[in-house]
Amino acid sequence: MVNKNAIILAAGKGTRMKSKLHKVLHQVCGKTMVEHVLTQLQAADIQNIVTVVGYGADTVKDALGDQVRYALQKQQLGTGHAVMQTEDLLGELAGQTLVVSGDTPLFTAATFNHLFQYHEQRHAAVTILTSKAPDPTGYGRIVRNEIGIVERIVEQKDASVEEQAIHEINTGVYCFDNQKLFAALKRLTNDNAQGEYYLTDVIGILKEEGEIVTAYQMEDFDESMGVNDRSALAKATKIMQKRINTQLMKDGVTLVDPETAYIDTDVQIGQDTVIEGNVVIKGRTTIGADCLIGAGSRIEDSTLHDDVTIMSSTLERSEVHSGADVGPNSHLRPEAELGENVHVGNFCEVKKAYIGAGTKVGHLSYIGDATLGKNINVGCGVVFVNYDGTNKLHTNVGDHAFIGSNSNIVAPVNIAADSFVAAGSTITDSTEQFDMAIARARQVNKPGYAKKLPW
């Protein structure tokens, strides 16, 4: 089996992005561009991957971790110079090496595999990945002879009128015979106006040496899109989102309006779940089967089991078990967990709390730092008072308890199972089973006193 290597070029600054963030670390559908490239290389069964870093090297290393090895390009002197920096790691190896830019998030593993296969079948020294561009302006053109053999790559500024009419373009991805690549790099010079070492010049060197130079033309031009500015980032995101949404629909998920379903790459959604319009689902969210995610919802890094309904609400790092429903207009903050058939109605907030099966929190309530048992009724306007100005404190509520509307539960307390908290109470002491707790001033009516008031 032929050894397969890859080099990811990720050293450039990307000034056109106008950003403090290194270009390849901008995200497309929840994953950085360079991570998209790495994921597809790994899916193509390429395990020996070197990333060339330079500007923002530490941040790129933080993003990719130990999944790859790194070569440092201290000065950005061109793509050929970048590949030279990998010689200590790759120079002595046999096999094939794919070179790809870290700002091309749309390439797929299938395309990489086809490129490798084409290259190997033709025993080439280098195979250029090409595509047909609807508008080739700005791209290097692939010039072939009368029998289709690649003669050269000509850049836009150097192209004749006839060459400018060519629609086959260089995508900037190459598959090299590894040893021939590094041998040719030793002959590479920077004798050009920019004083840089161009990887495309290696192709000319190999051609001069009589090596086989081929080009594999892929079908989907969109894959080759490089991202250099915010406009291109938005376009790449739209293309990626369409891919994600199309696959979800093929897998049995209903997207009412695919154009406004913003779903990240790593999200998983079960069959017969319905996603309405203007929904954002981010991070490593998993949604089960037969769920309904209502319009205007935002869900991030959360787990929803089967048959869950979320209406116009926000969930962050939360878990919702089967049969539960949330919203409209509620917020599950990190470490919220709802048991089976829990109802959290409108304008509620739950944070770092477990709510047991069958419990109902109807409206306008805050539950934080608490554990609630099963089949509890939490009335309107109940507040779990969890912060004393220094510490967050915990409250427990037992099964079948009833908490009346407009009550304050001041932590730390334990509301026992089957106990009853009267409406309007401020509870500061724990209760025993079957207690009724009432903590409010007795009402006093003063006859005729309202006439004396200034309103």
From Swiss-Prot:
Cofactor requirement: Mg(2+)
EC number(s) given by UniProt: 2.7.7.23, 2.3.1.157
Gene3D superfamilies: Hexapeptide repeat proteins, Spore Coat Polysaccharide Biosynthesis Protein SpsA, Chain A
Cofactor binding notes: Binds 1 Mg(2+) ion per subunit.
Catalytic activity, reaction form: alpha-D-glucosamine 1-phosphate + acetyl-CoA = N-acetyl-alpha-D-glucosamine 1-phosphate + CoA + H(+); N-acetyl-alpha-D-glucosamine 1-phosphate + UTP + H(+) = UDP-N-acetyl-alpha-D-glucosamine + diphosphate
Region (Pyrophosphorylase) location: 1-230
Residues holding Mg(2+): D103, N228
Main location: cytoplasm
Annotated binding of UDP-N-acetyl-alpha-D-glucosamine, by residue: 9-12, 23, 73, 78-79, 101-103, 140, 155, 170, 228, 333, 351, 366, 377
Subcellular localization: Cytoplasm
MF terms (GO), sorted A to Z: glucosamine-1-phosphate N-acetyltransferase activity; magnesium ion binding; UDP-N-acetylglucosamine diphosphorylase activity
Pathway the protein contributes to: Nucleotide-sugar biosynthesis; UDP-N-acetyl-alpha-D-glucosamine biosynthesis; N-acetyl-alpha-D-glucosamine 1-phosphate from alpha-D-glucosamine 6-phosphate (route II): step 2/2; Nucleotide-sugar biosynthesis; UDP-N-acetyl-alpha-D-glucosamine biosynthesis; UDP-N-acetyl-alpha-D-glucosamine from N-acetyl-alpha-D-glucosamine 1-phosphate: step 1/1; Bacterial outer membrane biogenesis; LPS lipid A biosynthesis
Source organism superkingdom: Bacteria
Region of interest called Linker, as start-end residue ranges on this chain: 231-251
Repressor is among the record's keywords: no
Active site location: H363 (proton acceptor)
Record-linked InterPro entries: Bifunctional_GlmU, GlmU-like, GlmU_C_LbH, Hexapep, NTP_transferase_dom, Nucleotide-diphossugar_trans, Trimer_LpxA-like_sf
Gene Ontology CC, one term: membrane
Region of interest called N-acetyltransferase, as start-end residue ranges on this chain: 252-455
Role, per record: Catalyzes the last two sequential reactions in the de novo biosynthetic pathway for UDP-N-acetylglucosamine (UDP-GlcNAc). The C-terminal domain catalyzes the transfer of acetyl group from acetyl coenzyme A to glucosamine-1-phosphate (GlcN-1-P) to produce N-acetylglucosamine-1-phosphate (GlcNAc-1-P), which is converted into UDP-GlcNAc by the transfer of uridine 5-monophosphate (from uridine 5-triphosphate), a reaction catalyzed by the N-terminal domain.
Family: In the N-terminal section; belongs to the N-acetylglucosamine-1-phosphate uridyltransferase family. In the C-terminal section; belongs to the transferase hexapeptide repeat family.
Listed NCBIfam families: glmU, PRK14354.1
Subunit structure: Homotrimer.
Name the record gives this protein: Bifunctional protein GlmU
UniProt organism field: Limosilactobacillus fermentum (strain NBRC 3956 / LMG 18251)
Record lineage: Bacteria, Bacillati, Bacillota, Bacilli, Lactobacillales
